[in-house]
């Protein structure tokens, strides 16, 4: 697992967490294509000029339908896609197996179960937090290198 900046067709950066298939327990094919790695957005995506990006300390995109999220992610260029159910579940099982189940923003900017864990809220966000602004306990692996915000927000 590593963090990597990957650029979309517009040349804009996304911060991604990159895994080998074996690290996630996933096959080496995705949508019928052979893959050496899975790149998963490190942060909840924000919208910039109507395009989703994985960047820290941004307002997360909200009120988007599943179909619209698929379209937006695929608009970034070849190979870009909305996280699949298999990828999401694999991250969850990884956290479970490694005893790092993430907490998150479940109580207006803080964790309900650990209120000392807080993120940065923003005006008009109704208790939502800026992407990546929470502590490492909000990441899938409990480190600064993990996928953020799998719980809450």
Residue spans for each PLM region:
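GGW-centered surface loops in extracellular recognition modules
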Residues: 1-34, 80
């Amino acid at each position: 697992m590593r963090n990597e900046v990957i650029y979309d067709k517009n040349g804009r950066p996304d911060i991604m967490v990159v895994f080998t298939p074996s690290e996630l327990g996933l096959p080496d094919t995705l949508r019928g294509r052979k893959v050496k790695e899975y790149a998963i957005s490190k942060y909840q995506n924000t919208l910039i000029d109507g395009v989703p990006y994985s960047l820290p300390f941004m307002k997360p995109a909200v009120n988007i339908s599943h179909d619209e999220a698929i379209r937006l992610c695929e608009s970034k260029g070849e190979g870009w896609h909305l996280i699949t159910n298999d990828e999401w579940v694999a991250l969850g099982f990884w956290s479970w197996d490694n005893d790092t189940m993430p907490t998150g923003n479940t109580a207006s900017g803080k964790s309900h179960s650990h209120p000392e864990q807080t993120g940065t809220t923003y005006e008009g966000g109704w208790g939502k937090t800026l992407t990546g602004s929470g502590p490492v306990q909000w990441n899938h692996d409990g480190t600064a290198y993990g996928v953020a915000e799998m719980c809450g927000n």
